[in-house]
Structures are given as C-alpha cells and as structure tokens.
C-alpha cells in the first residue's frame, strides 16, 4: 500500500489520504423535480448558454474535511495552481505532513507539465472508474445549491456555489457520510 511506503519514507511525518476531483457547472441550468400543488405545473426560467466554471474539491474522507476552489478551466496549468493552493492550505511540504492525493486519470492530472508541490504525492485510480472516486459523490450536494435557478452571469452562479460550499464545509459529518466508503483505507 502506498500509504505504508510514505510512512516508511517519512517516519516522523503525518501521512494523510485525500482525494480530488473537478465538476463543471455553467449557465446551462441544473434541473430537478420539485413538489407542487395538484393541478399546478412548476416552471423554471431557462436560457441555454454554454459558459462554464469548474468546482475543484479536495476532500479527506476519513474526517470530512473539504477544500473547495472555483476556477475558470480544467487544464494542466490551472490544476497545478489548484495543487499549489491546496498544499499551502493544508501545510503539506513541511517535514511533518505528507498528503497522498487520489485522483482520476483526467488528462490534466497525468500531464508531464503538472507541477506537484513538495509534500503532495499523487496516486491514480484505474481508468474509467468514477465509482471509485469518493469526491464524485460531492457533486449532487453541490448541485443542490444551484438547481432550478436561473443565472444571468457566471459570477451569480459562482456566488451561489460559494454559499453552498461554505455550508457544506461546515458539515463534515455529511461530507464524511458521502465520501467515506467502507473499503477506503482508514489512515488517521
């Protein structure tokens, strides 16, 4: 197991297991079924436009701790910036903290140009296996804050996402219940 190897290589460091994923959201609305009175038909204003923003999540399933970033793209350069920001936020790179970050095999995760900060160690899931990625389970939760809502501009959508992500961050037990699979390694 990769965690054991990291603990052996860094015996005085605390090794933590995190996972990361991205979710594209845009001005094309997220639609949900809703309850309504008998005989009434609920409506949602829709104006299909193809402008996108990306929600990055770094989650530690063992504790429910989560760090969110809203960024304009998903590519090698932006992913490298997200890694740098995350490493600073959690204090990775210090001799006493190492992060094993589990990722899918998106092209921007595996590119040779990815800059991996000191203290972050990448581990890739098998190809085409989103069901193994705990962070994937966060997207229905994040969608709830923007479902059935019309946004004129991306900035409005991003504001709604910020509210939703802050609320979710304050509820680690919910995050943990969605992301901590029974087979996920229990690394303290």
Label the predicted regions.
Residues 1-188:
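Short functional hotspots at interaction and active-site rims
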